[in-house]
Amino acid sequence: CALAARTGRPLLFLCDSERSATQTMEDLSALLGGGVSLLPAREITFYQDVAASREVAYRRIEAMRKVLSGDARAIVAPADALLHRMMPREAFNRNTISLRVGDVTPIDQLIERLLAAGYTREYMVEGKGQFSVRGGIIDVYPADALSAVRIEFFDDELDSIRAVDVMSQRSQGNM
């Protein structure tokens, strides 16, 4: 898209339905070779399906992260998606946790940041938005990630970050 390249900003495509937005996203991804995200609409129901609403929230967070990081060339959304406000950039950046091997971060401080960002502490990580703690090891399943990660500490120094299979709870290799 020449317009996106000229402005340096992602394009926003509005569609009349979620189905149309999904199809448009797939078509644009094929045309542009990737870099297209779907911003889903929140479902408004009288009963709350917690799992479904969390998944939509995670997909909205992923789309926002891609826009703010410059990874999105285009965003496709049903018009209903724009009826709900997004988190302000400052709040999003404040709740984003970036870690690298060698960082010095007290484990307790990381746990507090995860809780403040809306993660739930569990015995075992099974899904997005969860984390668990065992000694100097923290497993986290980020909202916008394809898999969980295992963060190992030696005292307060981050020693390794590895992908984790949530089914077996085994680490799969360094990231």
Which role does the model predict for each range below?
Residues 1-175:
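ASCE RecA-like P-loop NTPase motor cores
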